[in-house]
């Protein structure tokens, strides 16, 4: 800590205490809409599958607060924090498919300036938290490429992977990317949004660029 950007500096200790769960020394601090956040690395997602050590770190975030003298209050370990959603998510616009709070099984690929969701297999899903459908969404559209020769589907569900089904988007085989849509029902208010993937091919069902609600 210092009164000058060029020092002299005084060490004030750790922002987050070292424990067996903490790994890496690559933090980042930002301020977003009046709230400070600290980012860092850990193995928590890898530990959902195995505790055998290998380098599969993921990024976590936590709210960060300052004392009156400008020093930083100690931040609890990532999983011990409550990270509140800043505001409801707006689905009534073009949303890149790789936007997610959680994804199961799928991967992303980068092609030039574009990023796509790929490696989509039967039963996998993508989830967004706190999506505000307002008074109701009546249509879901997605820009996809299905070159597998077998029909695929995106189920639009609320609040759980097996939650209420609002609509099912059918993706027929075709060359290149195309925009397809389906009608929705009972999609209103604020919910967690699940896109659940099904398909006759079983694996590598399609590649997904973007989506929007209407």
Give the predicted meaning of each segment.
Residues 1-214:
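Carbohydrate-active catalytic/glycan-binding domains of CAZyme proteins
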């Amino acid at each position: 800590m210092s009164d000058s950007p060029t020092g002299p500096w005084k060490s004030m200790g750790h922002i987050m205490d070292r424990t067996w769960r903490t790994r890496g020394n690559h933090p980042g601090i930002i301020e977003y809409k009046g709230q400070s956040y600290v980012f860092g690395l850990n193995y928590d997602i890898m530990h959902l599958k195995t505790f055998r050590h290998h380098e599969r770190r993921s990024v976590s975030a936590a709210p960060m607060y300052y004392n009156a003298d400008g020093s930083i209050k100690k931040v609890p370990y990532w999983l011990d924090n409550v990270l509140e959603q800043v505001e409801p998510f707006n689905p009534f616009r073009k949303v890149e498919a790789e936007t997610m709070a959680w994804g199961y099984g799928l991967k992303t690929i980068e092609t030039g300036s574009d990023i796509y969701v790929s490696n989509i297999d039967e039963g996998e899903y993508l989830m967004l938290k706190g999506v505000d459908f307002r008074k109701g969404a009546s249509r879901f559209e997605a820009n996809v490429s299905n070159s597998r020769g077998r029909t695929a589907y995106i189920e639009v569900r609320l609040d759980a992977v097996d939650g209420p089904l609002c609509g099912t988007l059918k993706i027929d085989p075709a060359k290149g990317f195309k925009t397809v849509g389906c009608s929705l029902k009972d999609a209103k208010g604020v919910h967690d949004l699940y896109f659940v993937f099904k398909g006759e091919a079983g694996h590598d069902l399609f590649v997904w660029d973007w989506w929007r609600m209407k």
